[in-house]
Amino acid sequence: MLVLPGAATTDRRLNVTSNLASSSGTKEADALRIPNAVRATVDPVLEWIDGFCTEHLDDEYARLSAKMAAKLARKRPSPLLRGDGRIWAASIVYTVGQVNFLNDPSLTPHLTTDQFSAASGVPKSTLANKARLIRDTLNTGQFDPDFCRRDLLARNPMAWMIEVNGLVVDARMLPPELQAEARRRGLIPDLDALG
C-alpha cells in the first residue's frame, strides 16, 4: 500500500494513445516508451495486436495489450527478443483477456479460448504457456489495475484501496480534494482520463 499524505510515489500508468491505428510505428513506440534496442522486434508485435484487436475485440483491448507489450519490451533482457513475434502478440492479447475475463459470455467483447486460438492461429497450449510466463514476468493477474478495462476497473474494489494515516480506506469515500490528490499521484484510477 502507498501512503497518500506526503509520500513520494511512482505513476503506475502510461500515457498511450487510445487508437493505435492512428499512430505511426515510431510515434506509437515513443508514446509507449519502448527502448530503441527492441523497437524493431516490438513494432511487428504491436501491428499484429492492433490488427487482431480491431478485427476481433476493440480499441481498449488494443491499448491495454500495447501497454503490456511495452512493459515486456522494457524488461532486461526482454522476453520478446526470443521466439515468434506472432505468438508473443497473441499471448499478450490473451493475457490481457485473462485479466479482463474475455471468456465470460456476459461481457462484451467476448471470445472463448477455442475462438481466440482459432482467430489467432496459435494453439491453446502455446497461448496458456506464454500467458503464464507473461503473468509471472509482470506479476499480473485478474483485475490488475494496470491492465484492467475501464468498465471492470470501476467495479474493482482493490483498485480503490489506499492507505491514509496508517488506515486502509476506499478512496471513493474520501473527500473530493483527497481523491484528486490520489488520482494525481496515480494511486487510484482516473476513469475520466481512461476515456
Would you name each region that the model predicts?
Residues L2-G6, N15-I87, G97-G195:
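Basic, alpha-helical nucleic-acid-binding regions used in initiation and control of genome expression
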